[in-house]
Amino acid sequence: MAATTCFFFLFPFLLLLTLSRAATFEIVNRCSYTVWAAASKGDAALDAGGRQLNSGESWTINVEPGTNGGKIWARTDCYFDDSGSGICKTGDCGGLLRCKRFGRPPTTLAEFSLNQYGKDYIDISNIKGFNVPMDFSPTTRGCRGVRCAADIVGQCPAKLKAPGGGCNDACTVFQTSEYCCTTGKCGPTEYSRFFKRLCPDAFSYVLDKPTTVTCPGSSNYRVTFCPTALELEDE
């Protein structure tokens, strides 16, 4: 009886301890080129906020439970001085190595909200365009991953091609309600269908049919840039 009573007192504490554990994100660069990984929740950096990743390198960050609207992305063709100030051709976040805000399009985005009523929510988004192929998967059991690894840049419509590389979203280029959904009412367009055809797992426009994956709270994750490069090496 005493043991049962002790369990009932300890159970809420153990549950709270589980739900309060920071999630681990391993960010891996399998591209043949250097990228500058970034992690932010919009108003502040996540962990260090950003880091250079040469081909084959990885960076592990810890993200606090309850984080809502976090994003991880790759920046390309960057230059930073010793103070961490500089510029990137895609994904630039105000000229900082350690991002405190979200990046400038085009960016392929790994998006997540952690421990929302005991659940994690993850997705990949092309709403802000595409710059680097990506896989976003749990490293613990309980849910599947999502991937956008098609050659979007190579097939990008001429009007969406970004001068610094990557493929812009239509809202960034045209700035109209049809593409930006500023009225709260919009449907798929020829450009969103282009993204959806190549990456069905990813959001293609603001009101796209949800492709969010629900995972158990306190799961750990891996974000891989250029995931198919790894598969080719393993063959």
UniProtKB/Swiss-Prot annotation:
Cell compartment(s), UniProt: Cytoplasmic vesicle
Q: List the disulfide bonds.
A: C31-C226, C78-C88, C93-C99, C143-C215, C148-C199, C156-C167, C171-C180, C181-C186
| Signal peptide segment | 1-22
Q: Which PROSITE patterns match?
A: THAUMATIN_1 (PS00316), THAUMATIN_2 (PS51367)
Q: Which GO terms describe its cellular component?
A: cytoplasmic vesicle
Propeptide part(s) removed at maturation, as residue ranges: 230-235
TM annotation in the entry: none
Q: Keywords in UniProt for this one?
A: Cytoplasmic vesicle, Disulfide bond, Signal, Taste-modifying protein
Q: Which is a Pfam family this sequence falls into? A: Thaumatin
InterPro entries linked to this entry: Osmotin/thaumatin-like_sf, Thaumatin, Thaumatin_CS
**Member of which family?**
Belongs to the thaumatin family.
Reported function: Taste-modifying protein; intensely sweet-tasting. It is 100000 times sweeter than sucrose on a molar basis.
Q: Which PANTHER family match?
A: OS03G0233200 PROTEIN
Under which name does UniProt file this protein?
Thaumatin I
Organism equals Thaumatococcus daniellii (Katemfe)
